[in-house]
């Protein structure tokens, strides 16, 4: 299915989207009313200026009887009215900007709050670049297009009715010439707007894909270059870029036809007014000043039709972007907490009872998993890639909910406690390090913002990060780049370990926590971990089996099941799957 067909909104969907937009604007009704009032003042002032100009012309066309005093008074009046119109335009801009930026801020805040309530499955299945595009580019287009377009639409309608009333007062037949020809521009604009709307929707969708691809390429540039995939990456980007160019050119082609097409209609109107008005002036039906007023009004009457047609196109694009933003806001939240969810009081006792889980309905990953972890035990989880090790960690943290069975901490089902208290009970160090853009100190104190400097330094020393931090240009005040590019992967992992060392929650999750650290530092870190894990229930996911010899219990997982269980020596003695895994990692060393 094409992007255009897939994203096309029905009239009912457009109506619903527009109603939601108006709901977002409602908190700023005072600014909206002010905007409409000053727009009306601006239109009235602009409509009054042609009358003054016409009067001035008539006062200068008498037979040797030019009223200079009258012309001067009119000139002063024109200056005053023009100043009022300019002031009104400035106030209109102030009000519109306030509404636009306020609504943009509110929407982005709402979108970020939404992301924090979305299930991990949504974030795993949607490119981060597309989500960023919805929060940034689509919100900007939506706010600018709808709010500014609405004001232009209102001003245009006022101008149309205002000029129509003034023209009818002056001369009905000439007015009919204007009224009969001008609607042609609406017919043309409506046809072009329908054609361009679908392309604007496709443009927004493809732009999201492009942002996601660029984000992916930038984050993985080292891997791309290491594997020599520059050409393939460029080809993929060129394909998406070509799609964006194609839909953008089609959208711009039809929207750009609007202005010349409506201007052609305007020229016909202007010529018709000039011809009919000249005939009336020759016969004495109107004065030259009145003809001048009519020509000016004819131009002002047709101008809003040009603007309205352009605004309609802009509104179509804005509605398409608004629909994408609301699609994000309407995404299904993670399973809500129970009404009486209590704060978890963990004692370290963790039970998994007949747990089953699958990411896809037809692909079971974990089936019938049961486990009883006593307080203070160190549980190592090993197995081949894809056996469910990290998935089990996600279930313990309730990033995903089990499909069946239950997970209990301190005898309480984790679905009956608050997520914040559950996740706050674990200290987590992952293989994939994440640091925020900020100072080293801020990153270490991420889980405890009120930590003193002494506490931060103590945590860094415990994680063996203090020595390298001291060598940084600003020490603990060194700013880490957004992607952590100014420190090594191992240093990033040390900071993540220090972050957990500072908080020391009652339970720990270490997912290959020392994978990016050199062997010498790893030995020291393992000793620090050993002290930290004393008395704390700890889950250790490891690929290097040499790191989990001291675990109280080693769970060997295969195809979502625990196939072996015991300590290191027991499992080696059994000569089963664990023994094969362990020996395979040391075959190269022994040979």
Residue ranges and their predicted role:
Residues 26, 37, 49, 70, ...:
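Hydrophobic alpha-helical transmembrane segments of ABC transporter permease domains
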Residues 77-85, 89, 182-189, 255-269, ...:
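Hydrophobic alpha-helical segments in the permease module
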Residues 229, 253, 270, 300-328:
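Cytosolic ends of transmembrane helices, especially the final helix of ABC transmembrane type-1 domains
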Residues 32-88, 168-173, 284-288:
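Transmembrane helix-loop-helix hairpins at lipid-water interfaces of multipass membrane proteins
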Residues 337, 343-591:
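ABC-type nucleotide-binding domain
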Residues 2-11, 101, 109-133, 137-139, ...:
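Short intracellular "coupling" helices and adjacent cytoplasmic loop segments at the cytosolic face
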Residues 27, 120-121, 137-146, 150, ...:
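An intracellular "coupling" helix at the cytosolic face of ABC transporter transmembrane type-1 domains
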Residues 1-46, 61-75, 92-96, 100, ...:
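Membrane-integrated ABC transporters
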């Amino acid at each position: 299915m094409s992007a255009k067909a897939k994203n096309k909104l029905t009239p009912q969907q457009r109506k619903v989207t527009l109603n939601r937009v108006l709901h977002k604007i409602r908190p700023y009704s005072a600014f909206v009313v002010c905007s409409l009032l000053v727009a009306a003042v601006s239109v009235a002032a602009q409509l009054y200026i042609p009358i003054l100009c016409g009067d001035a012309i008539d006062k200068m066309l008498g037979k040797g009887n030019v009223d200079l005093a009258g012309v001067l008074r009119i000139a002063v009046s024109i200056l005053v009215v023009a100043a009022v119109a300019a002031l009104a335009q400035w106030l209109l801009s102030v009000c519109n900007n306030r509404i636009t930026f306020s609504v943009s801020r509110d929407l982005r805040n709402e979108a970020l709050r939404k992301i924090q309530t979305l299930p991990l499955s949504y974030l795993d299945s949607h490119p981060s670049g597309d989500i960023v595009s919805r929060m940034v580019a689509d919100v900007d287009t939506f706010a600018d297009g709808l709010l500014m377009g609405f004001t232009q639409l209102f001003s245009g309608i006022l101008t149309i009715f205002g000029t129509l009333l003034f023209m009818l007062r002056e001369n009905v037949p000439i007015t009919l010439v204007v009224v009969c020809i001008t609607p042609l521009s609406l017919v043309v604009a409506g046809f072009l707007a329908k054609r361009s709307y679908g392309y604007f929707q496709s443009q927004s969708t493809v732009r999201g894909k492009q942002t996601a691809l660029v984000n992916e390429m930038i984050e993985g540039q080292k891997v791309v270059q290491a594997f020599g995939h520059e050409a393939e990456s460029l080809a993929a980007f060129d394909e998406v870029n070509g799609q964006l160019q194609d839909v953008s050119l089609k959208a711009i082609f039809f929207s750009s036809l609007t202005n010349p097409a409506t201007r052609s209609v305007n020229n016909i109107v202007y010529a018709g007014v000039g011809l009919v008005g000249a005939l009336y002036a020759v016969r004495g039906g109107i004065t030259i000043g009145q003809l001048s007023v009519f020509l000016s009004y004819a131009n002002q009457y047709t101008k809003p039709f040009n603007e309205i047609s352009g605004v309609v196109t802009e509104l179509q694009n804005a509605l398409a972007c608004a629909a994408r933003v609301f699609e994000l806001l309407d995404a299904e939240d993670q399973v809500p907490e129970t009404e009486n969810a209590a704060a978890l009081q963990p004692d370290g006792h963790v039970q998994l009872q007949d747990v089953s889980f699958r990411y896809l309905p037809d692909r079971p990953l974990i089936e019938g998993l049961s486990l009883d972890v006593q307080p203070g035990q160190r549980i190592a989880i090993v197995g081949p890639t894809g056996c469910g090790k990290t998935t089990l960690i996600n279930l313990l943290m309730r990033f995903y909910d089990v499909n069946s069975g239950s997970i209990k901490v301190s005898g309480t089902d984790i679905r009956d406690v608050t997520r914040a208290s559950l996740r706050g009970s674990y200290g987590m160090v992952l293989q994939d390090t994440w640091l925020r853009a900020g100072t080293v100190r801020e990153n270490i104190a991420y889980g405890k913002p009120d930590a003193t400097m002494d506490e931060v330094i103590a945590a860094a020393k415990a994680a063996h990060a203090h020595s390298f931090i001291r060598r940084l240009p600003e020490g603990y005040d060194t700013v880490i780049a957004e992607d952590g590019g100014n420190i090594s992967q191992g240093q990033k992992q040390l900071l993540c370990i220090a972050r957990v060392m500072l908080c020391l929650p009652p339970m720990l999750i270490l997912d290959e926590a020392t994978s990016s650290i050199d062997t010498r530092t790893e030995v020291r870190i393992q000793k620090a971990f050993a002290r930290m894990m004393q008395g704390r229930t700890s889950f250790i996911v490891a690929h290097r089996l040499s790191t989990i010899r001291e675990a109280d219990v080693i769970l060997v997982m295969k195809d979502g099941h625990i196939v072996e269980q015991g300590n290191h020596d027991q499992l080696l003695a059994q000569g089963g799957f664990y023994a094969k895994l362990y020996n395979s990692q040391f075959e190269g060393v022994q040979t």
